[in-house]
Amino acid sequence: MNEYLKSQSIAITGANSYVGLNFIKFCLDKKIKVKAFCRNPGSFSDDLKKNSYFEGFPYTLSSKSELKLKNVDSIIHLANQRVNSSRIGFNIDPNLEGAKHLIAQCKIHDIKNIIFLSSHLAYKETLSQYGKSKFACEKFFIDNGHTVVRSGIVFGGEALGFYKNLLFALKSNKFFPIICANAPIYPIHIEDLMNIMLMLSKFTHNTKKLYCLGEKHSIKLNFFLSRLAYKFYNKKIIFISLPGKIIYILTNALGYF
């Protein structure tokens, strides 16, 4: 197993994200070669840049240029662009356009396996624009023979990005506003997610194309957040429930949801 891993080469998009940076270090510890693609490869640490198994490259979802994918065995596609402006008149999904270009590049370089990280929010009836974008990308990747991983909320590992901001908010506030406090979630530790994605990256003829990952039994969102606050800061959080339905109606009418 270890000898095979030493010869493996993986490309990661969205590589400077929370999952991306943790996954890079996870692969490098196993002597797996990593080509890391992100908006600003100069932001990678000096330790990463000095690692002979690591290369960083500029990348955006809107780019149509050729990607440096020579000798890559598989791709972990983490890159995602959230739309922060009004969605009224929003016609082109940059995530779907990025998926199309990535698949076209894989055909050029004869790469058979893309692992697309999606979300439990991705399903046909989802109200979330984020979930709608993920769902559209899922279909495109599956239709082209690639693999989709629907993940629950990711936690653990080195705290970066959204997870870092979440922990900071829990640390800094005794009162915590929350929408859908009782919503069922299926969290997954980042170590488990990385192990499964790495395993799937080695399958070139996998007949199953959609995997849903997370705890077997759901827990409530407010319980999950309260456990994080207690574990890291030994504190109790008082949650302030916000009216999710009213907020959805207002934001949807304004075109921001």
Where are these regions (language model features)?
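N-terminal Rossmann NAD(P)H-binding glycine-rich loop of SDR-like oxidoreductase domains
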Residues: 9-30
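Substrate-positioning beta->alpha
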Residues: 160-164, 179-201, 208-212
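Conserved Rossmann-fold NAD(P)-dependent oxidoreductase catalytic core, especially the SDR/UDP-sugar
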Residues: 94-133, 147
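Mid/C-terminal beta-alpha module of Rossmann-like enzyme folds, strongest
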Residues: 200-257
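N-terminal Rossmann-fold cofactor-binding loop
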Residues: 37-42, 61
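Conserved beta-loop-beta element that borders a ligand/cofactor-binding pocket
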Residues: 139-157
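NAD(P)H-binding glycine-rich loop region in Rossmannoid oxidoreductase-like domains
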Residues: 57-97, 105, 120-124
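SDR active-site strand-loop-helix element
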Residues: 13, 37, 75-79, 114-120, ...
